[in-house]
From Swiss-Prot:
<dbReference type="GO" id="GO:0042777">
    <property type="term" value="P:proton motive force-driven plasma membrane ATP synthesis"/>
</dbReference>
<dbReference type="InterPro" id="IPR055190">
    <property type="entry name" value="ATP-synt_VA_C"/>
</dbReference>
<dbReference type="InterPro" id="IPR020003">
    <property type="entry name" value="ATPase_a/bsu_AS"/>
</dbReference>
<dbReference type="InterPro" id="IPR023366">
    <property type="entry name" value="ATP_synth_asu-like_sf"/>
</dbReference>
<dbReference type="InterPro" id="IPR024034">
    <property type="entry name" value="ATPase_F1/V1_b/a_C"/>
</dbReference>
<keyword id="KW-0066">ATP synthesis</keyword>
<dbReference type="Pfam" id="PF00006">
    <property type="entry name" value="ATP-synt_ab"/>
</dbReference>
<comment type="function">
    <text>Produces ATP from ADP in the presence of a proton gradient across the membrane. The V-type alpha chain is a catalytic subunit.</text>
</comment>
<keyword id="KW-0067">ATP-binding</keyword>
<dbReference type="Pfam" id="PF02874">
    <property type="entry name" value="ATP-synt_ab_N"/>
</dbReference>
<keyword id="KW-0406">Ion transport</keyword>
<dbReference type="InterPro" id="IPR031686">
    <property type="entry name" value="ATP-synth_a_Xtn"/>
</dbReference>
<keyword id="KW-0813">Transport</keyword>
<comment type="similarity">
    <text>Belongs to the ATPase alpha/beta chains family.</text>
</comment>
<dbReference type="GO" id="GO:0046961">
    <property type="term" value="F:proton-transporting ATPase activity, rotational mechanism"/>
</dbReference>
<dbReference type="InterPro" id="IPR022878">
    <property type="entry name" value="V-ATPase_asu"/>
</dbReference>
<keyword id="KW-1278">Translocase</keyword>
Length: 576
């Protein structure tokens, strides 16, 4: 029986609907009001009534308004043309919305995610008679710098035989590419695009692997001390202004991945505008073209309706999984998951659910876990490997890492890059705290060496705290030297200049080379007459290494500075 319904109550963006017939959880409905149809999603079903969250402002919705049921879940359209686009959480292209509406978006306006008129040069790789299943490749088109594979839609569960496939040529996303037939004789037309529900993970692959290969970000403190694996997860919690967004932008520019997807969910409009302005101007170091050519941005600012924040996170991860199915490495950056959690708290309050800690819903942990679990590295049907690496920034109030969203995130991620106000105020960027952060993954430098260096940093911090109480005079010259060496490691290796053309991106080879130099200094014993001499010597070392960081690796000036450094170390080193 086809469902019918009418509005019986409105609280904020939660609408209560009286229904006749059957409906399903998470079904999309349209509320007819004032000549417009507003999109909403059913989030609770009760006897004879359902509650739906509206993805638009609910102004004007009245008791008695009619409801149109779609019998479909919230979906995204997948196909060539997603890259270099900027979408809202419902996959409306913002550039086209702006062209139609101007600065202020109209309610009830939903546009096609893909350009229906653009023709793509299709190259067939399958042939008539081939047996295919969901996720198998039929051909490819060139999208920017990648080969965009045209696949059998993931919702096709049977084994099919190709009975017709077009010759190489130019086609739109709606043109027929192939016809497949199942064992029962049922035929299906394949086009370049299809829809997939955002809350359902894509599972058209052979096997799931344990992440092990490092995703090189070319940021020293991450790759060496707190690495992220391809297909792994990491979080970047930190207070406002600590550099979360800049760190994510640097990572997206230099990371060893094929496609970057940015979900700006609930960030301040100014920050989102900054991202939208800067990204087209950023040059991809690998191709020399705009970084936008391999980037897709899903943005929902804090001024947009809260329900669309949740949609934007799921839309982004689904697009990421789609490109993973092509054997590509994907990096998804969610900024910030705290705003998404706040949207859940708002809806939970309106549903009158029993609140958990700080009024967040009791199921907060399981929802956050289900999002991060969609990251991973998989073996595809053809034996190739694809990965989705997920990094979420968290904005805890006052930088308090004990709050529920940060704690729920820490339980499921593989690396924790904790930014602190203390380091950002001291202008130590990236402001990742080396004593609080951690990672479960393998890095580009041997773990024994990094473990030794971290213990050195901890000792240096203890001595620094002691010096704040008793002063420099109250500690031995040996302890003072440990403190100076830890400061040297911090200044020359943990800190990095994102605005310098050389220091912004450091290759794994260079990281190993520079770390070995510093490791040797940490392990060496030096002889000094007094603390002033020790400080002067370490400052000289620091300036020399900082100059090396700003010069191209193993070129003439770099080699000259290295020789000077070796002579300096040799002059004060104790021989045994």
């Amino acid at each position: 029986m086809e469902a019918r319904g009418k509005v019986v109550g409105v609280i904020g963006n939660l609408v209560t609907i009286e229904i006749v017939g059957t409906v399903s959880m998470n079904e999309i409905v349209f509320i007819k009001t004032g000549g417009r149809s507003l999109k909403a999603e059913i989030i609770r079903i009760r006897d004879g009534e359902v509650d739906a969250q509206v993805f638009e402002m609910t102004k004007g919705i009245a008791v008695g308004d009619d409801i149109e049921f779609t019998d479909k879940l919230l979906t995204v359209e997948l196909g060539p043309g997603l890259l270099s686009q900027v979408y809202d959480g419902l996959q409306n292209p913002l550039s086209e919305l702006a062209a139609q509406c101007g600065f202020f978006l109209e309610r009830g306006l939903y546009l096609s995610a893909l350009d229906r008129s653009k023709k793509w040069s299709f190259n067939a790789t399958a042939k008539v008679g081939d047996i295919v299943v969901a996720g198998d490749y039929l051909g490819f088109v060139v999208e920017g710098t990648i080969k965009h594979k045209i696949m059998v839609p993931f919702y096709r569960k049977d084994s099919y035989k190709i009975v017709e496939i077009v010759s190489d040529g130019n086609y739109t996303v709606d043109d027929k590419i192939a016809v497949i037939e199942n064992d029962a004789g049922g035929r299906h037309v394949i086009t370049m695009s299809f829809h997939w529900p955002v809350k359902v993970p894509i599972t058209s692959y052979k096997d799931r692997l344990i992440p092990s290969e490092p995703m090189v970000t070319q940021t020293r403190i991450i790759d060496t001390f707190f690495p992220v694996a391809k297909g792994g997860t990491f979080c970047i919690p930190g207070p406002f202004g600590a550099g979360k967004t800049v760190l994510q932008q640097v990572t997206s520019r230099n990371a060893d991945v094929d496609v970057v997807i940015i979900a700006a969910c609930g960030e301040r409009a100014g920050e989102v505008v900054e991202t939208l302005k800067e990204f087209p101007e950023l040059i991809d170091p690998r191709t020399g073209k705009s970084l936008m050519d391999r980037t897709c941005i899903i943005c929902n600012t804090s001024s947009m309706p809260v329900a669309a924040r949740e949609a934007s996170v799921y839309t982004a991860i689904t697009i990421g999984e789609y490109y993973r199915q092509m054997g590509l490495d994907i990096l998804l950056l969610a900024d910030s998951t705290s705003r998404w959690a706040q949207a859940m708290r708002e809806m939970s309050g309106r549903l009158e659910e029993i609140p958990g800690e700080e009024a967040f819903p009791a199921y907060l942990e399981s929802v956050i876990a289900s999002f991060y679990e969609r990251a991973g590295i998989v073996v595809l049907n053809d034996g190739n490997v694809g990965s989705v690496t997920v990094g979420g920034s968290v904005s805890p109030a006052g930088g308090n890492f004990e709050e529920p969203v940060t704690q729920a995130t820490l339980k499921v991620v593989g690396a924790f890059h904790g930014l602190t106000r203390e380091r950002s105020d001291a202008r130590k960027f990236p402001a990742i705290n080396p004593l609080e952060s951690w990672s479960k993954y393998r890095g580009v430098v041997e773990s024994e060496k990094t473990g030794y260096a971290r213990s050195f940093l901890a000792k240096g911090n203890e001595i620094n705290q002691m010096m704040k109480v008793v002063g420099e005079e109250g500690i031995s010259i040996g302890d003072f030297l440990v403190y100076l060496k830890s400061e040297l490691l911090d200044a020359c290796y943990l800190q990095q200049n994102s605005f310098d053309s050389v220091d912004t991106a450091v290759s794994p080879e260079r990281q190993n080379y520079m770390f070995d130099i510093l490791y040797d200094i940490l392990q060496s014993d030096f002889k000094f007459e007094n603390k002033l001499e020790a400080r002067s010597f370490v400052n000289e070392l620091r300036q020399n290494i900082l100059d090396m960081n700003l010069n191209p690796f193993k070129e003439e000036k770099f080699n000259k500075l290295e020789n000077t450094l070796k002579d300096l170390v040799r002059s004060k080193k104790l021989d045994f």
